[in-house]
Amino acid sequence: PDELIEKFGADTLRLYEMFLGPLEQYKPWDTKGINGVHNFLRKFWRLVHDHENNFSVCESNPTKENYKTLHKTIKKVEEEIERYSFNTVVSTFMICINELTDQKCNNREIISDFTILLSSYAPHISEEICFEVRKNTGMQKPVHKIT
């Protein structure tokens, strides 16, 4: 796994292992699908960074559609955690980011809440984004102390 962490990062490997399938199911080790998980994290990163890789979120109020996407994600993640279905939790995160991207939503409030939700699964990227989201807001706690 060291080579995979070097190439893709620890968050990608962590999410990929969860994405492989249910905990109780045997899964042969195969890294063919790791790019999909890596692309998800990159897509999340691009949602909150401009073309020059500067952090960029909007301050406007989220739309009803933005809230609906976030709340649907929170509900689904809660349900899947109860079943220990971490593979579908990761899938739910991917769907959420796809929908937020389609909505062109990089709203500070929505991104902050999504980052907190993601933080137990991808702590490194969550910490970086949470730091930027909360910069200059007076709420500079590490993400693991928020959850």
Q: PLM features: residue spans?
A:
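Helix-rich, typically C-terminal accessory recognition domains appended to large enzymatic cores
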Residues: 3-147
